[in-house]
Amino acid sequence: VNGDRYELVVTDRQTLLDVIRDEVGLKGTKRGCTTGACGVCTINDASGAAILSCLTHALEWDGEAITTIEGLEKDGRLDAIQQAFVEYGAVQCGFCTPGVI
């Protein structure tokens, strides 16, 4: 997760969202509709493809690299999309922003 390795005990009932938020402690990935429709739970795989973490079993990702909103900034600098959201005031209330980015 975001370049860090975690050794966790995960059940076959936990989603990737559950593990990211509840086990790893990263709260940027949000829990919304839990049906994949809203996109607030979106994270990226190693290729940059969007993954709906609320619909994905955590065990399927054992040993795989994923990136959450917290992993986008590098050396204290926001990534280009994050910076554009700030510059153009695209955040509104901000709840869904991590999934959109």
Report the location of each language-model feature:
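Signature of N-terminal electron-transfer/Fe-S-associated modules in redox systems
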Residues: V1-I101
